[in-house]
Each structure stands twice: as C-alpha cells, then as structure tokens.
Amino acid sequence: MSANKNLRAILVMVTAAALFTLMDAGMKLLSQYYPPMQVTALRSLASLPFVYFYVTWRSSFKAMLQVRWPLHLLRGVIAVVMLVTFVIGLHNLALTETYTIFYVAPLLITALSVPILGEKVGTARWIAIGTGLTGVLIVLRPTGAGVFTLAGLAVIASALCYTFSAIIIRILGRTDSMESLMFWLITMLAAGSTLFALPQWLPIRPQDAWLIAGIGLTGFCGQWGVTYAFRHGEVSAIAPFEYTGMIWSLGLDRLIWRTSPDRYTLIGAAIIIGSGLFLVRRERVHAEAEHP
C-alpha cells in the first residue's frame, strides 16, 4: 500500500482521536445521571441526523443496500457492546485511566491484522507499538488492583470489541462504500441500544441538550475519520495513533474534573507521542522515496 495513503490516513486518525476524546468526555458527564445503555443510545441517536445528511449529500442511497449484511450486522452488535462497556468504565474511572486501559486495542489490532488480513508488520512498527504500550503502562502503573475491577474489565472488553470492529472495517472496505459503513453502524447502534435502554429510560434534562448535540456531532465526525483511516490505510500502521487521544484526555481531565497528571503520566505521555512521531517520520520517508 502507498505510504502517502498511510500518512494521509494517520493524519485523519489523529484528528478523529481528538474528536472522540471530546465525545467521551461528554458521555462521562452524562453517565453521572443516565444509565450506561441510555448514554449509548443518546450518543448514537444524536449522530443519526448528521449521518443521514451526509449520505443525502453524497447521493449514496443506492449503495446502502449493496453491502455484505452478515458483517454489517456483526459490527453493529459489537458496536453496542463496545460502547456500553466503555461507558461503564467512564462512569467509574478517570478519563485518562479509562484511555490508558483501552490502549491495549492498537496492539491487539496489529497482532490480529497479520493472521486475519495478511498484512505485513515490520520490526519498526512492532517497536513503535511496543514503545507506545510501555508508555501506557507507565501512566497506569498497574499493580493488578486497578485493572481487574469491574470497570477495568469493562474497558478491556470494550477494547477487544473495538479491535474486531477495526478489522471488520478493513474487510468491508474492500467491497462496501464508506457511506454504507457509517450509515449502517450508526443506524444499528441507535436501534439496538435504544431498544435495550427503554426499560430504564430516564427523562432528558433540558440542560443536557447542548451536550447531547455536541456528542452527536463529534461522534459523527470522529466515526467518519476512523472509517476513512482504517479503510484507506493499513490497519497496523494506523492503530498506534489511537495513543494520541491520551494527550487530549489529560487536558480534559484537568479542565473539567480538576485532576492533574503526575510525573509518571507525563513521562508515559511523552513516550507515547514519541512512538507516534517515529511512525509518522517513517511513513513520510517512504512517501518521499516513492515520489522523488
């Protein structure tokens, strides 16, 4: 695959990670009042208008039915489980801690992209990913007690679901349109989560309307970015840039919840950024070699 395509996909992924961090902060705020399943439903329902507008603008309704239904349905189910378990983690853990545990996903994506997708993962990528994961461990300083709680296990389950979702995107991207990937994911996520949320549904507070709308917008834009990145770039090259969300989570924890990172968190964050910059540099060198 062209290194230029990988570099473009990496830039899109970095932007998507920032948007998703904003969305996750909004969901954490909502989770203090609403049940996890309802937060999941509100996130997907708020994104529906943006998705439908996008599909209409692209005039892609015909492509909506020409899809590989089994994989889309599987991805929809995985998405519901992924978001619900992630919200459970957000409710009980700090945003930065939640992200730290979740960042096992890029390593899982890279590992599974070899046997499932047949991608080649060179030594440099493994080193960069391993280095980034080391930074995550420094931030978390896991002793076992912090990870193996219900909230910690929920985030690990969410990361595993995200891993399979990313791989399914790559498989579907070979035959299905980008619009169909987004349309059916959000539609199935909204339908499934709303159905399960109805028994415990709480009235929407007026003061939460702006927050729900913001979650919908950032969720749509972030989903577009992730779908684009995994569809047009190599999964194993894109996955490490999930780590950049850590930087945004540190800032939002300080801004909203008044929690400051300690020196271990700062050291770990520096390592994570360094591993990402190393891969960006590597992809750029390859791109220049292909197009002198």
Question: Predicted regions span which residues?
Answer:
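Membrane-interface helix-cap regions at the ends of transmembrane helices
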Residues: 47-68, 134-146, 189-208, 214, ...
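Hydrophobic transmembrane alpha-helices of multi-pass small-molecule transport proteins
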Residues: 124-141, 264-283
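Helix-helix packing/entry segments at the starts of transmembrane helices
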Residues: 42, 99-104, 172-185, 224-254
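Loop-to-transmembrane-helix transition segments
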Residues: 8-16, 55-56, 61-85, 150-158, ...
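Transmembrane alpha-helical segments that form core, pore/gating elements
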Residues: 25-28, 36-37, 51, 145-204, ...
